[in-house]
């Protein structure tokens, strides 16, 4: 979501005093995916609700990008070699359920739907 990032950076530069931007930056080498997939993987992180896009001011959430139909976390995990073991090892299914629970918590906590 490049426009979202640009808007947030612009807003941060207009604030007097400190600001903080926590950006999601997929790593092609460490995560094991082709460079051409960088934006797709970054968007999947948001669309699976593993990486919520939101803003806070003075400790309060002020804006949240809603996700009408969250995608299953498997779609995000399968794109990266670092998660390959979850789909081949015994007990991997349980670990994926735990990761899905994180996304579900994000949906509830941040009001993503």
Role assignments for model-derived ranges:
Residues 1-15:
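Conserved thiamine diphosphate
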Residues 20-24:
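Short, conserved beta-strand edge motifs with alternating hydrophobic and charged residues
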């Amino acid at each position: 979501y490049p426009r979202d990032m640009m808007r947030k950076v612009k807003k941060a530069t207009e604030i007097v005093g400190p600001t903080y931007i926590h950006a999601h930056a997929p790593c092609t080498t460490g995560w094991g995916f082709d460079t051409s997939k960088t934006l797709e993987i970054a968007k999947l992180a948001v669309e699976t609700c593993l990486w919520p896009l939101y803003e806070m001011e003075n400790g309060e959430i002020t804006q949240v990008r809603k996700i009408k139909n969250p995608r299953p976390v498997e779609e995000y995990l399968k794109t990266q070699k670092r998660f390959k073991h979850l789909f081949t090892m015994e007990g991997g299914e349980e670990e994926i359920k735990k990761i899905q629970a994180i996304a579900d918590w994000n949906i509830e906590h941040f009001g993503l739907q």
